[in-house]
Amino acid sequence: MTIMRKTHPLMKMVNHAFIDLPTPSNISGWWNFGSLLGLCLIIQIASGLFLAMHYTPDTLTAFSSVTHICRDVNYGWLIRYIHANGASLFFICLYLHIGRGIYYGSYSYVETWNIGIILLLLTMATAFMGYVLPWGQMSFWGATVITNLLSAIPYIGTDLVEWIWGGFSVDKATLNRFFAFHFILPFIIAAMAMVHLLFLHETGSNNPLGIPSDCDKIPFHPYYTTKDFLGIVLLLAFFFTLVLFFPDLLGDPDNYSPANPLNTPPHIKPEWYFLFAYAILRSIPNKLGGVIALLMSILILALLPHIQTAKQRSLMFRPISQFLFWLLVSDVLVLTWIGGQPVEPPFIIIGQIASFLYFAIILILMPIAGIIENKMLKW
C-alpha cells in the first residue's frame, strides 16, 4: 500500500515541501529564520484578525477603540501587545534572515532573492500602515511626513500625495484606506512567501560552505522539523518575555496621546525597524535625493547578485569580506541609533558618514575585496 502523503494531491505538495524535501546535511541555526518568519506571519494574521473585530477605522473613534480593546475586551491588552511586538519580532527575524543571505551568498539564487526583496517591501508597507491605525500623535505625524515624501516626485508628486490621502491632509479617508490595505497585505505576503518557497525548492537550499550539496542530502523531517521546533520554542520564550514584562519597550510614548493636527511632536520618527532607512533619508539635504537614497537603501539588495566578484560564494573563508560584512552590520546599527536622534550636530555628520559608508561598503568595497581574495587564492 502506498503512503497517503505521497499520493494525495494536497498532501503530496506538503510532503515535497516539508517532509521528504532533500536538505543539505550541514545547514546551521541561521537557516531557522525562514520557518520563524512563517510563524511570525501566522501570529500577526491571527492577532490582527481579533483586533480588527473591535477596531473602528474612523478619526473620531480609532484611538478610543484601541483603548477599549486594551481595557474592556477579554485579553484585549494581550492581543494588542502580541500584535505590536509581533511586528518588531517579524523585523528582527527578517533582518537576520537577510544578513544570513548576504553572509552565505544566498543571493546567487536570483529569483528567490528578488521575491524576498518584494516580500521585504510589502512587509515594510504593511508595518507602516499598521503604525498609523491607533491614531496617536506619532501615527498621525508619521503618516503625514512619510506620505508627504511622494511630493518630491517631479510633476505628479503633489497630485499623487493628495490621491493617497483622499483629500488635502491625512484624515478619515486616509485612515480608512490604510486599514483596508493593512488587512489585505498580510495575505498577499503569505501568497508571495509560497512563491518564495517554490523558487527555493527549484534550486534547493544553500549551505554554510556555499558549495553544491547534492551528494549529501537528508530528509527535512525529522531532522530539520526538530531543529525548527527548537528555534520556535526559543523565539516564543523571548517573545512572550517581551510582551508580558516589557510591552512598551520598543514603542513610542507619543503614541499614547491622541492625534492632534495642531500640535507637532518635538521629534517625529518611525518605529525602530525603519530608523536606519530614515537616517539615510535625513542625511541628504535635498528632498528628492533623500527619497531616492531611501529607496536605494532597500533596492540595493537586488544588485548584490550582479556585483559579486568573488569566486567563492560564502564569506566563511574570506576574512576581508567578513570584516566588511560586520562593518556593514555595525554601520546599520549606527544608522538605527542616528535615526532616533534629533537633527542637530554631531548627529547630522555621523548620519551622513554612516549613510555614505553603507553604500560604499556594498557597491565599492565588497566587490574590490572579492577581487583581492581571488588574487590571494590565485583564482
From Swiss-Prot:
SUPFAM superfamilies the record matches: a domain/subunit of cytochrome bc1 complex (Ubiquinol-cytochrome c reductase), Transmembrane di-heme cytochromes
Binding positions for heme b b566 per the UniProt entry: 97, 196
GO cellular component: mitochondrial inner membrane; respiratory chain complex III
Positions with a binding annotation for a ubiquinone: 201
Annotated localization: Mitochondrion inner membrane
Cited Gene3D superfamilies: Cytochrome Bc1 Complex, Chain C
Membrane topology according to the record: Multi-pass membrane protein
Example GO molecular function: ubiquinol-cytochrome-c reductase activity
Cofactor comment: Binds 2 heme b groups non-covalently.
Lipid metabolism recorded as keyword: no
UniProt KW Mitochondrion keyword: yes
Cofactor(s) required for function per UniProt: heme b
Protein role: Component of the ubiquinol-cytochrome c reductase complex (complex III or cytochrome b-c1 complex) that is part of the mitochondrial respiratory chain. The b-c1 complex mediates electron transfer from ubiquinol to cytochrome c. Contributes to the generation of a proton gradient across the mitochondrial membrane that is then used for ATP synthesis.
Family stated for the protein in its record: Belongs to the cytochrome b family.
Subunit note: The cytochrome bc1 complex contains 11 subunits: 3 respiratory subunits (MT-CYB, CYC1 and UQCRFS1), 2 core proteins (UQCRC1 and UQCRC2) and 6 low-molecular weight proteins (UQCRH/QCR6, UQCRB/QCR7, UQCRQ/QCR8, UQCR10/QCR9, UQCR11/QCR10 and a cleavage product of UQCRFS1). This cytochrome bc1 complex then forms a dimer.
PANTHER family in UniProt: CYTOCHROME B (PTHR19271:SF16)
Record-given protein name: Cytochrome b
